[in-house]
Amino acid sequence: MTHTPPNDQTIVDEYFKLRTNRRRSRLAWLFGMIATYGLTPDALEGFSWGPEASICIQGKRRPISPVHPQWAIIFRLKEEQPRNWQDCLQSLSEQLYCAMAYQKVGVNITDLLLSHQMRKRLYRSVKRPRKVLRPLAGVS
């Protein structure tokens, strides 16, 4: 049996379901970051905000842009970032994994990452048309 990754609407709905639950509202921020940037919680450690909703990760040359830039705005990721997020990232990650294990969150991290990778490939191929091979000059 094949498993299909969640569609965009499912991800957005799950984010707002988390956001409206007072006990899980901080998890919503982490969920939104994973969905928007396609990074695991561990990879988010030490990030900083870059231009135009991108984030800069230590050890990466270029900023990481969201596949859906509107998600950074809709989810208010910059504004809703926990004040001491560096200190509580490990705790937030554990809480998110537990919530997923007990099915309090309908979309797991693996599915979010898979969905992000698929959309990234799709949008990259749409942005860059395939190169057409041209015959070499003088060759018939």
What are the language-model segments listed below?
Residues 54-100:
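Basic, alpha-helical nucleic-acid-contacting "clamp/cap" segments
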Residues 31-38, 78, 100-103, 130-133:
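Hydrophobic, Leu/Ile/Phe/Ala-enriched alpha-helical segments that form helix-helix packing faces
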Residues 12-13, 45, 113:
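Generic structural signal for individual residues within well-ordered alpha-helical segments
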Residues 2-41:
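Basic, Lys/Arg- and aromatic-enriched nucleic-acid-binding interface segment
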Residues 33-54, 109-110:
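Short, charged phosphate-coordinating catalytic segments
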Residues 86, 93-140:
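Short, basic (Lys/Arg/His-rich) helix/loop patches that form interaction surfaces
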Residues 4, 10, 20, 25, ...:
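Positively charged, low-complexity intrinsically disordered regions
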